[in-house]
């Protein structure tokens, strides 16, 4: 998903683009290839972008972070972390400290969501930057060093929308949604004194309002408003929904632009509605996808974007000269096979740009990435993808074959379907046999039959060739289930030992299918009860929803069930008959704790780890007796032992036996973490793949015991894989042991720490400092130790106050000590 996109004014072959959770990228060959320019450890959640286009300032860029709709997982939203700046043409980035809270798990700053960022090219004496944040408009006169709020007030609502844009002469327009202080449409000639120019007939109810200034006549400005309930244009949208949208054109006449000084024209009646299908009607999806753009040289060509791109050749003065030029395939309707994408394009539009040297050429950022047309004027607009190495895909799930050494990978992609590859080549194509928001999947042992699901619990059995082309299909989600009880990503689990058995959730009910192999391919899009049986035990209360399913490998036939309200259940002999669904002893955590995963040791079904994804609840619980007792295991992933504070959201986990050791992995909203020893609240998790995965969201982890294949799905940077043979492949440490004496003082410290090590033989020590989230604070420090007492002096004068961990590795034995810097 791309909201941030811009040409470099110095060279239009240089394009900068930011993924909504994938980081900042730069292309110097017009999108033929891309290089990620934010470091793996830096902010990945990029929502808007701007270049300072003034002469001599062109190397200065800014991007904003965080989006309030779109970057969310299960019960968790993903916040940004302020404004970032580049002074070398976008090759490297640094945060503007006054805008960053460094608390990505807490909505505690105005700059946690940014919708738009603009610079004033008319001002040569000041470095003026405007930012539209959650409910507020800010201005900086010194390139982001300091900021002053221009419009807005207390931010009490999550969904508070704003936008800001500026003419080449420095006239600023801003919008603020109707649930905010200073709601309305605003105009300023100096960016400091503002007048509300909202027309008296404009809807009193509106959420997001986006701005489109006419480049050929900057006195003309379009405003496209979402959720104008009861006003503007009514449209029926897919899945039985409806919405209202308004489109207005403002023209400045005189004075301060209010009253007779500004002319308003309501163009809402030309917003496309009553099309042949609900997919064709205009749909902003509650403000998620919304853009309006006026062509640079033809003011009659105006494009509005929601799920689709709609082009008008008369400025939307009538509904007769409009056409779909991107998004969904024209005429799409609900049901598999009945809908798809416009050729070589993608739904859900966010940003539109025109090539400066040839404004027939347009590029567009949407949920599918970046796309380009050579001629936006053509009756049928043709597109090409620019996603060549632009690795910003968002995965909900990953599935692998159970067969050792198989290269088959399947991924459930946000708004990019269920995709597969049969190759481990990094340049391999992932083909899509099933469109939508890809969800859970199962792969039969023959690697020909696939069980694929998308959003809202739609499931198909498909026979695919090795290019993932459909050879046959059959819909198979139970006809007797109430789909209103399904989750957005509805849990499905294929039995770990038997590819003929599958488990399925329906709210508080559990289903099983013991006859997958005999589901016939009839090319039917109708639900089917074939092979499905419902367990008679239903979970209480009726409103409860199953959120996680996990089946055991050895011993087989144990099924664990997680829910949205912390409760965990176990089913023994889950593969036959009507076994009891037994609630396990209560876990001492908040009742709202949302279980996203239950990791099972593949060689011991009694060892499990529960993952709760909410912020401000304790995230990880470990059991070695099948859930009869529980121990906290999040350790340094939590700020406080209660789970409160600035700990990340934990997403998924794996327990991996490797020889005599066991590796524990946890995917979080700030990266992948590992440990080889669970030690309650003192468990030390170390960040893994800091130079590759970095702080990207790790949403899903899967492991194949047969050959050690580990696959990680990220929500923003695609899929990663490796093979494991020992714990040392991930952690260069063994068990914590007391084979040497070590003393640290003082603790807490101010700036210096003394470490005294007593050792029997000469050896080498590696010292690494980690922050509270297990992230390395720099390069390892190596010290030669000699038999007897050794003293190591560590300087922490450049460190911020807080909790840190000092790791000492001597002869592959590890000692970790928590320190506090005051």
Regions found by a protein language model. Give the residues of each.
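Short clusters of hydrophobic/aromatic residues that line enzyme substrate/ligand-binding pockets
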Residues: 201, 733, 785
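Active-site pre-Tyr helix/loop in NAD(P)-dependent dehydrogenases
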Residues: 67, 730, 748
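C-terminal outer-membrane/trafficking sorting elements
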Residues: 737-745, 749-822
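Acidic/proline-rich low-complexity IDRs
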Residues: 125, 385, 583, 587, ...
């Amino acid at each position: 998903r791309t909201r941030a996109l811009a040409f470099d004014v110095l060279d239009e072959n240089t394009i900068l683009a930011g993924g909504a959770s994938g980081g900042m990228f730069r292309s110097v060959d017009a999108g033929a290839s891309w290089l990620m320019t934010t470091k793996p450890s830096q902010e990945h959640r990029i929502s808007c972008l701007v270049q300072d286009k003034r002469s001599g300032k062109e190397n200065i860029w800014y991007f904003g972070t965080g989006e309030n709709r779109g970057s969310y997982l299960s019960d968790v939203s993903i916040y940004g972390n302020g404004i970032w700046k580049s002074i070398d043409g976008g090759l490297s980035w640094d945060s503007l400290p006054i805008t960053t809270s460094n608390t990505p798990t807490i909505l505690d700053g105005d700059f946690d969501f940014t919708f738009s960022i603009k610079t004033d090219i008319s001002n040569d004496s000041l470095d003026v930057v405007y930012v539209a944040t959650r409910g507020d408009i800010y201005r900086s006169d010194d390139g982001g060093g300091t900021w002053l709020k221009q419009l807005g007030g207390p931010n009490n609502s999550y969904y508070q929308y704003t936008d800001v844009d500026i003419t080449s002469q420095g006239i600023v327009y801003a919008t603020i949604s109707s649930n905010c202080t200073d709601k309305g449409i605003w105009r300023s000639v100096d960016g400091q004194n503002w007048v509300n120019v909202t027309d008296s007939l404009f809807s009193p109810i509106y959420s997001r309002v986006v701005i489109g200034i006419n480049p050929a006549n900057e006195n003309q400005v379009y405003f496209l408003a979402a959720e104008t309930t009861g006003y503007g244009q009514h449209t029926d949208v897919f899945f039985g929904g409806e919405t209202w949208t308004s489109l207005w054109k403002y023209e400045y006449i005189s004075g301060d632009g209010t009253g007779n000084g500004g002319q308003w024209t309501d163009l809402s009646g030309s917003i496309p509605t009553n099309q042949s299908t609900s997919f064709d009607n205009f749909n902003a999806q509650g403000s998620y996808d919304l853009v309006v753009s006026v062509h640079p040289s033809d003011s009659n060509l105006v494009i509005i974007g929601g799920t689709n791109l709609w082009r008008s050749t008369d400025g939307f003065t009538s509904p007769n000269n409009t056409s779909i030029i991107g998004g969904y395939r024209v005429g799409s309707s609900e049901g598999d096979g009945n809908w798809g994408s416009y050729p070589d394009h993608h739904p859900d539009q966010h940003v539109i740009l025109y090539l400066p040297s040839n404004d027939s050429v347009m590029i567009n950022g949407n949920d599918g990435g970046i796309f380009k047309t050579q001629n936006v004027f053509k009756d049928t607009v043709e597109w090409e993808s620019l996603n060549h190495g632009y690795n910003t895909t968002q995965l909900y799930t990953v599935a692998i074959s159970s067969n050792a050494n198989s290269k088959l990978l399947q991924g459930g992609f946000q708004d990019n379907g269920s995709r597969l590859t049969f190759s481990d080549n990094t340049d391999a194509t992932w083909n899509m046999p099933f469109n939508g928001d890809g969800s859970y999947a199962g792969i039969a042992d023959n690697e020909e039959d696939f069980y694929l699901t998308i959003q809202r619990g739609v499931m198909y059995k498909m026979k695919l060739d090795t290019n993932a082309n459909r050879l046959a299909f059959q819909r198979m989600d139970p006809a007797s289930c109430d789909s209103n009880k399904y989750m957005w990503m509805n849990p499905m689990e294929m039995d770990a030992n038997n590819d003929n058995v599958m488990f399925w959730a329906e709210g508080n009910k559990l289903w099983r299918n013991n006859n997958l192999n005999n589901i016939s391919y009839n090319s039917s899009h109708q639900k089917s009860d074939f092979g499905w049986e419902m367990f008679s035990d239903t979970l209480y209360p009726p409103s409860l929803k199953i959120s996680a399913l996990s089946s055991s490998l050895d011993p087989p036939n144990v099924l664990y069930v997680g829910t949205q309200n912390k409760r965990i259940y176990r089913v023994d002999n889950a593969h036959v008959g009507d076994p009891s669904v037994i609630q396990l002893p209560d876990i001492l955590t908040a009742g709202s704790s949302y279980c996203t995963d239950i990791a099972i040791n593949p060689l011991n079904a009694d060892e499990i780890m529960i993952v709760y994804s909410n912020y401000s609840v304790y995230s990880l619980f470990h059991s070695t007796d099948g859930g009869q007792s529980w121990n906290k295991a999040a350790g340094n992933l939590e700020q406080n032992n209660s789970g409160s504070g600035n700990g990340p959201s934990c997403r998924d986990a794996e327990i991996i036996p490797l020889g005599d050791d066991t590796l524990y992995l946890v995917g979080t909203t700030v990266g992948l973490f590992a440990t080889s020893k669970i030690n309650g609240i003192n468990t030390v998790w170390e960040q893994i793949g800091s130079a590759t995965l970095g702080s990207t969201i790790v949403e899903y982890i899967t492991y194949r015991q047969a050959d050690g294949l580990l696959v990680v799905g990220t929500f923003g940077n695609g899929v990663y894989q490796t093979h494991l043979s020992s714990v040392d492949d991930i952690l260069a440490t063994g068990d914590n042991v007391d084979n040497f004496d070590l003393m640290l003082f003082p603790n807490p410290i101010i700036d210096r720490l003394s470490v005294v090590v007593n050792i029997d033989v000469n050896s080498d020590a590696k010292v690494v400092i980690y922050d509270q989230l297990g992230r390395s604070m720099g390069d390892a420090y190596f010290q030669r130790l000699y038999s007897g007492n050794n003293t190591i002096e560590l300087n922490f004068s450049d460190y911020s106050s807080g909790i840190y961990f000092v790791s000492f590795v001597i002869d592959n034995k590890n000692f970790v000590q928590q320190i506090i810097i005051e």
